[in-house]
């Protein structure tokens, strides 16, 4: 029985995908739910599994083809016949070991009675492109010694060999020149990232304001309770949970930063869906922690951990990345000291975290060493005034420098 492999439903507003790659070749056996083909959409990468056990008998859509939802990608022949045929000895060619006469000259023995070059001589010959036939060995049974190679170099063997090498390298210059460039088609995800970032720049009146935060209090709190926190909640206590809580706290006071423009209207969101930017091998994705303002610190950390794992494994669903109202990105994990993050349209704000660096700070009239981080808030100046943006960032700073405020809701 033959079963068709079809493009699954890819989520709201997604109607087509690009064939990324086939994991199986024609004639190969497949198991139930084993990934057959990878589909790339403008939001996620999806693996299509085999619905039955059998053998892949036909591939209709090739790599790079654009296919619509429910389109047939190929066929799998199910049943014992398909499996036994794919594993039968006659279907698999086993290469025979080469006979002694078919072995390459490099593996053949040296002429009878002749010793191979000494290791130091062989190394010197290889470095100077000198063949054994160009040198007469003075060692026992004609072995080439290091002194023989040095003597040949002094007599000009190197020069004649260099001419031959130069001629050979000139003939291969053209292929090498062609290999200096490579043209690769962008993936659907990369095309979407490029388009959305450029749209954000062209549409929003984007501006960035900066501040710095002393991370001493958060780092001390984390150091004291991280083991107990992980033991109780089953997840590590990171910095992102504190930042998410601080953002949710500040957004209550400044709802415009959590709003968006729709035509001539401003849409205020009475909830916080925090987008957490995650870097993957295929590009940046922003999964969403829904109703983060209603979550505890432990719940936020668990959800961030879950979404981050899905993102790195390429298993995020489209729904996992929809509906965000504010984004947090952490360039500090890559060593960034300061940046101007680009808005994730249609959102009106994005917070950029950066690397923590010890710096000399004046505190209470004294110079002390503090672990400092630069914060950057990019915002849409069309609806967020400068005073709101600056004060919003100050509130985030205050919450992080005094994390007890987050617990007491102050």
From Swiss-Prot:
Cofactor note as given: Binds 1 lipoyl cofactor covalently.
Region (Disordered): 86-120
Keywords noted in UniProt: Acyltransferase, Lipoyl, Transferase, Tricarboxylic acid cycle
One BP annotation, GO: L-lysine catabolic process to acetyl-CoA via saccharopine
Keyword hit for Acyltransferase: yes
Peripheral subunit-binding (PSBD) domain ranges (all copies): 116-153
Biological pathway: Amino-acid degradation; L-lysine degradation via saccharopine pathway; glutaryl-CoA from L-lysine: step 6/6
Residue ranges of every copy of the Lipoyl-binding domain listed in the record: 2-77
Bilayer-crossing regions: none
Keyword Transferase part of the UniProt annotation: yes
Family: Belongs to the 2-oxoacid dehydrogenase family.
Job of this protein: E2 component of the 2-oxoglutarate dehydrogenase (OGDH) complex which catalyzes the second step in the conversion of 2-oxoglutarate to succinyl-CoA and CO(2).
Protein name in the entry: Dihydrolipoyllysine-residue succinyltransferase component of 2-oxoglutarate dehydrogenase complex
Protein source organism: Bartonella quintana (strain Toulouse) (Rochalimaea quintana)
């Amino acid at each position: 029985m033959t079963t068709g492999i079809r493009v699954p439903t890819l989520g709201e507003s997604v109607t087509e995908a690009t064939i990324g790659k086939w994991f199986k070749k024609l004639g190969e056996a497949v198991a139930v739910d084993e990934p057959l083909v990878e589909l790339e959409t403008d939001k996620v990468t999806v693996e299509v599994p085999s619905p039955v056990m059998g053998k892949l008998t036909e591939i209709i859509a090739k790599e790079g083809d654009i296919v619509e939802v429910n389109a047939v990608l190929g066929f799998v022949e199910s049943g014992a016949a398909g499996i036994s045929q794919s594993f039968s000895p006659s279907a698999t060619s086993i290469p025979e070991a080469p006979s002694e006469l078919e072995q390459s000259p490099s593996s053949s023995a040296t002429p009878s009675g002749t010793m191979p070059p000494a290791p130091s001589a062989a190394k010197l010959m290889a470095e100077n492109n000198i063949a054994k036939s160009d040198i007469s060995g003075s060692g026992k049974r004609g072995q080439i010694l290091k002194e023989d190679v040095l003597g040949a170099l002094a007599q000009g063997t190197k020069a004649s060999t260099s001419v031959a090498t130069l001629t050979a390298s000139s003939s291969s210059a053209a292929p090498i020149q062609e290999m200096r460039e490579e043209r690769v088609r962008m993936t659907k995800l990369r095309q979407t990232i490029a388009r959305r970032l450029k749209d954000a720049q062209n549409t929003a009146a984007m501006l960035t304001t900066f501040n710095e935060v002393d991370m001493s209090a958060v780092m001390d709190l984390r150091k004291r309770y991280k083991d107990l926190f992980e033991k109780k909640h089953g997840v590590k206590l990171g910095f992102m949970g504190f930042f998410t809580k601080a953002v949710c706290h500040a957004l209550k006071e400044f709802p415009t930063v959590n709003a968006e423009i729709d035509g001539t209207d401003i849409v205020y969101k009475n909830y916080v869906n925090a987008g957490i930017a995650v870097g993957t091998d295929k590009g940046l994705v922003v999964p969403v922690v829904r109703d983060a303002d209603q979550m505890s610190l432990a719940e936020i950390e668990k959800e961030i951990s879950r979404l981050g794992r899905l993102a790195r494994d390429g298993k995020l669903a489209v729904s996992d990345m929809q509906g965000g109202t504010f984004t947090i990105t952490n360039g500090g994990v890559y060593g960034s000291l300061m940046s101007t993050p680009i808005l994730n349209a249609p959102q009106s704000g994005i917070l950029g975290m950066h690397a923590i660096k010890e710096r000399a700070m004046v505190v209470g009239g004294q110079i002390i060493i503090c672990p400092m981080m630069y914060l950057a808030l990019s915002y849409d100046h069309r609806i967020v005034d400068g005073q709101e943006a600056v004060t919003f960032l100050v509130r985030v700073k205050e919450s992080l420098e005094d994390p007890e405020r987050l617990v007491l809701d102050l």
